[in-house]
């Protein structure tokens, strides 16, 4: 937190072969505040600007960042982190343990959308200027994995700018401005238009990129984004529309990079609401409180048809809240419900809805790949068994407030576990919402099961891999039996880039400028 001279900042040499790099995506990051909004567009973007104690490498493994090393504390009390010396924030101030303690207090505060990350944490204490101890409520063997996206802010800069706590609703100085330790710094921010970044000359790590200026532009119209890539107006777009991928890939000047994301797309329900809120049956008792109705939804949605016609074979069917590539995926529960309209109708009749019912389906139209088209298909499929959905699709900046205000009967959600572990969605999506315990913060529908709640701390504390997997298998089976959510598919990755660009495609869909090279 001590300030350095400008001359000291200029010691780092600029990368050789430097160029300007422009890229586009469908969603503009909602904020520059790393603790305000827990969403991939925000966290992915800000991982270029801010850093955590640990980070993910090219192979997605955890590696040192602002902490040079770490070790478990005695008796499983927590973890001790030894901080990197000589690190500076982009304004020249020095990073130390005070910034870590402050960033914990800020990111775990009730005002922060990331506070659920710290549910297993009881305290963070400074040992000395470059050592911190993070105390956990129980032994937590995967804790370092869980903080890869926890970004450290400069305590003095944040407080002096009046942004001591995040404010995702009204915004503050940190909403439009940033001061991280990462490889790039924000030099211009026009929400919804452009965000410009330049290399942080005082960055502590070895520079691998060749970028001297990077410019991000949100482009929601897919045809416009493709045209910008093909014309060379931008060097990279994410995503390439599925229907255009083959055509784009035929062009010699561009390349389509394909992969499978860690994100599962699913349908969620208003478990807690006593009545329906939308459609002709608004005010009537809520059918989704009955597991048979939720099972009917699972049998009514023709996932193979969605994969074939909308996702063009690029996605994979999902059976759980995590994909098969994630640690803790339950092999015994890998089978998803069959498409069976007759079974869906029978389940509805058994639940007392032989003629079906009307309700509302909320959906984003610029957050996930083909999200609105998927919701339109779901509406048609549900109608065939008597469930008449009123679709309300909207931009993501309007979508999250609607979900947090409980303005839905059913909704579409995508989830990518930040830890790449099956414990993650149990903590965020399946545990009973508990603001004080910082659990269930994305469980918008209020699903609640005492067994799941009791299993979570045992899963978090279990050191034996086999015992832990057995508990995760039990949790996956219970969530399937309850049909807490209806997993649909694992979302594909389709990035388009000019052929002279090399980069790393991460399965969490985070785009890292520090690996971009333009020849």
Where are these regions (language model features)?
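Alpha-helical secondary-structure segments
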Residues: 22, 96-103, 129-131, 135, ...
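N-terminal lobe/hinge region of extracytoplasmic solute-binding protein
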Residues: 24-74, 105, 179-183
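Gly/Pro-rich hinge or "lid" segments in bacterial periplasmic/extracellular proteins
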Residues: 149-209, 213-215, 341-342, 346
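Acidic-aromatic pocket-rim loops
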Residues: 37, 260-279, 398-460, 507, ...
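Ligand-site clamp/hinge motif
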Residues: 201-247, 291, 379, 388-390
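Surface-exposed binding/hinge segments that line
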Residues: 116-163
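Extracytoplasmic/peripheral linker and loop segments enriched in polar/acidic and small residues
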Residues: 286, 291-295, 299, 307-308, ...
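Structural transition elements
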Residues: 316-350, 367-371
């Amino acid at each position: 937190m001590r300030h350095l001279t400008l001359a000291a900042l200029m010691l780092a040499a600029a990368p050789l072969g430097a160029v300007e790099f422009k890229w586009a995506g469908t969603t503009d990051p909602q904020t520059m505040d790393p603790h305000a909004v827990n969403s991939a567009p925000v966290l992915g973007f800000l991982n270029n600007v801010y850093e955590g104690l640990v980070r993910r490498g090219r192979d997605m493994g955890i590696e040192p960042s602002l902490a040079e090393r770490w070790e478990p504390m005695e008796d499983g009390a927590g973890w001790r982190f030894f901080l990197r010396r000589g690190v500076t924030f982009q304004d020249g101030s020095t990073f130390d343990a005070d910034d870590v303690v402050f960033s914990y207090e800020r990111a775990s505060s009730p005002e922060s959308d990331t506070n659920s990350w710290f549910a297993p944490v009881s305290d963070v204490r400074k040992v000395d200027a470059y050592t911190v101890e993070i105390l956990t409520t129980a032994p937590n063997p995967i804790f370092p994995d869980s903080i890869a996206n926890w970004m450290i802010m400069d305590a003095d800069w944040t407080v002096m700018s009046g942004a001591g706590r995040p404010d995702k609703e009204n915004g503050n100085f940190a909403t439009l401005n940033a001061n991280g330790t990462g490889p790039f710094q924000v030099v211009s921010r026009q929400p919804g238009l452009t965000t410009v970044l330049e290399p942080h000359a005082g960055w502590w790590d070895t520079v691998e990129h060749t970028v001297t200026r990077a410019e991000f532009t949100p482009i929601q119209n897919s045809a416009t984004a493709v045209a910008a890539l093909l014309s060379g107006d931008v060097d990279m777009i994410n995503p390439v529309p599925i229907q255009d991928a083959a055509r784009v890939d035929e062009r010699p000047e561009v390349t389509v990079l394909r992969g499978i994301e860690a994100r599962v797309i699913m349908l969620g329900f208003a478990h807690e609401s006593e009545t329906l809120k939308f459609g002709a049956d608004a005010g009537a008792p809520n059918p989704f409180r009955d597991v048979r109705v939720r099972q009917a939804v699972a049998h009514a949605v023709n996932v193979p048809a969605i994969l074939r016609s909308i996702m063009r074979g690029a996605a994979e069917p999902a059976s759980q809240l995590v994909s098969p590539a994630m640690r803790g995926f339950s092999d015994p529960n890998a089978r998803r419900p069959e498409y069976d309209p007759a079974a869906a109708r029978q389940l509805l009749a058994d639940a007392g809805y032989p003629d079906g019912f009307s309700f509302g389906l909320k959906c984003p139209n610029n957050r996930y790949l083909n999200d609105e088209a998927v919701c339109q298909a779901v509406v048609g499929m549900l109608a065939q068994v008597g469930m008449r959905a009123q679709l309300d699709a909207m931009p993501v900046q309007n979508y999250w407030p609607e979900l947090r205000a409980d303005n839905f009967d059913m909704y579409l959600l995508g989830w990518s576990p930040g830890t790449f572990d099956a414990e993650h969605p149990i903590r965020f999506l399946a545990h009973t919402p508990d603001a004080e315990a910082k659990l269930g913060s994305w469980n918008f529908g209020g699903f609640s099961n005492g067994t799941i709640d009791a299993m979570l701390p045992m899963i978090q504390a279990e050191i034996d891999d086999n015992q832990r997997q057995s508990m995760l298998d039990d949790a996956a089976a219970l969530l399937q039996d309850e049909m807490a959510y209806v997993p649909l598919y694992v979302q594909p990755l389709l990035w388009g880039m000019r052929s002279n660009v090399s980069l790393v495609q991460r399965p969490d869909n985070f785009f890292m400028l520090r690996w971009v090279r333009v020849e």
